[in-house]
Amino acid sequence: MVLGIGLDIVETERLGRPLDGPGGFAERVFTAAELAACASRADRVQALAARFAAKEACLKALGAGILEGGLRQVEIVSDARGAPRLRLTGTLAERARRYGVRHAHVSLTHEPSFAAAVVILEGTKTRAARPARRRDAGAWTLETLLNGTW
């Protein structure tokens, strides 16, 4: 049974500026493993932008806002074939367990100007029904992340 679907799109240039700038944006958003996996790629910014989009899509699929679960609690890893997979930690992993999530499908795509991701969560319905999303759950902007006010 599908428990949640999330979709996100990112303008790569807008994300690329803070990735290469001062302020620790990359370290606040990505895990060390994600940064290492993309470090030597020719399409580094696009690859990180796709991972950023997947993190956002995962939060949407879980019905969580950015303030409820940090982006570093969603890690995008590759399986043996190189396909993207989600690894959840902290409160987001607990939330997924409570909701009965058993499998996550992740699809990433990018072009020079945009990156996008879709996350589909499957599992069995549990008694812990997913609460309605808070009205302000998505009330933030990329600038909020850049300024570290989340």
Residue ranges and their predicted role:
Residues 1-150:
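Core catalytic alpha/beta fold that binds nucleotide/phospho-ligands
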